[in-house]
């Protein structure tokens, strides 16, 4: 599969924490597009387990092997971030029909706020379809083993958070 002319895409999310499901989508997007920017949302309305800086750092660490992937934190509207980095496409993951309904509404809002911004939806590989950051946090908080759901650096950080 060949790439089109220069394409810069944004994969936005809270990534609290980044999971193997996220990484699966990032690796696949990196093969399809020239540049992938992981946009880690500050999300002040959410009570995140990890700070914005930690979440950006995790994203950078787990994607070091991908030359065309970077990670940045942002606050405010995602469309403003996309405009600031001159991105023309958003990557969004869909696990369920509930995700689809939510993303469909967001996509229409994004189009109104930033005409020309397209959304590309990727479904996760079967082994990652059930993974969510929320579930991973819950399992970790209750002492469960999350090593099969998140990259090693994240599993270690979750283990440390549980000790605190």
Curated annotation (Swiss-Prot):
> What's one GO-annotated cellular component?
cytoplasm
UniProt subcellular location: Cytoplasm
Report the record's Gene Ontology biological process terms.
coenzyme A biosynthetic process
User: What SUPFAM superfamilies does this protein map onto?
Assistant: Nucleotidylyl transferase (SSF52374)
Q: In which pathway does it act?
A: Cofactor biosynthesis; coenzyme A biosynthesis; CoA from (R)-pantothenate: step 4/5
Predominantly, its location class is cytoplasm
Q: Kindly give the CDD domains that the UniProt entry links to this protein.
A: PPAT
Chain positions of site Transition state stabilizer? 22
The entry marks the following residues as binding ATP, namely 14-15, 22, 93-95, 103, 128-134
Give the required cofactors.
Mg(2+)
Q: Which Pfam family, giving just one, matches this sequence?
A: CTP_transf_like
Q: Which reaction is catalysed here?
A: (R)-4'-phosphopantetheine + ATP + H(+) = 3'-dephospho-CoA + diphosphate
Q: How does it assemble?
A: Homohexamer.
The role this protein plays is: Reversibly transfers an adenylyl group from ATP to 4'-phosphopantetheine, yielding dephospho-CoA (dPCoA) and pyrophosphate.
Identification of the protein by name: Phosphopantetheine adenylyltransferase
The species this protein was found in? Vibrio vulnificus (strain YJ016)
């Amino acid at each position: 599969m060949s790439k089109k002319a220069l394409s810069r895409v944004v994969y936005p999310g809270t990534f609290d924490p980044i999971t193997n499901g996220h990484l699966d989508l990032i690796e696949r997007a990196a093969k399809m597009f020239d540049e992938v920017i992981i946009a880690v949302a500050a999300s002040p309305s959410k009570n995140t387990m990890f700070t914005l800086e930690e979440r950006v750092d995790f994203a950078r660490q787990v994607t070091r092997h991908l030359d065309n992937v970077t990670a940045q934190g942002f606050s405010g509207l995602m469309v403003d971030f996309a405009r600031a980095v001159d991105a023309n496409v958003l990557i969004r993951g869909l696990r369920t029909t509930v995700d689809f309904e939510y993303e469909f509404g967001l996509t229409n809002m994004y189009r109104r706020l930033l005409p020309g911004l397209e959304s590309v939806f990727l479904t996760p590989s079967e082994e990652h379809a059930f993974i969510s950051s929320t579930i991973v946090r819950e399992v970790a908080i209750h002492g469960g083993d999350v090593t099969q759901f998140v990259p090693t650096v994240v599993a270690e950080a979750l283990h440390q958070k549980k000790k605190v």
